[in-house]
Amino acid sequence: MQKCQYILEPDLPPLAVESQIKHAQRACELDKARLGQSAKSYTAHRWRVHESQLRGAILSHIAAARRIFLKFAQDGSRRTIPDHLQANVSLFEDLDIYVEMVLMQNEIIIINAHDHTPGMPRLPQ
């Protein structure tokens, strides 16, 4: 099995602030998290888990005080996208996945999730 490469600390995006993390936590706890297209596809067909398991994995990530980062724009500017968070979340004991959360009004979030891109460095937990 190939060893994972992680993004180097100086290249990481800023960490999410407590209010953003609480927003994501409340949305998962209150079942106000909605799955984006990639998360729907991966939970149903690839990982074969119920969406509540994905929410539970996010809650476990938060409870363990693992890191959640802001998301950089794709243009290489290192500008962060407002209300977009990302994390390397453990879905199962031996499966870490990429999760993006978009914070919406009324404690709602949109979750996008997929396997890590092969050959690309991952966010650390």
Where are these predicted regions, by residue range?
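Compact soluble domain cores
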Residues: 1-82
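Aromatic-residue detector
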Residues: 67, 85-88, 117, 121
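Enriched for short, Lys/Arg-rich terminal
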Residues: 96-125
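Basic/aromatic recognition patch in beta-strand/loop cores that engages polyanionic ligands
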Residues: 76-104
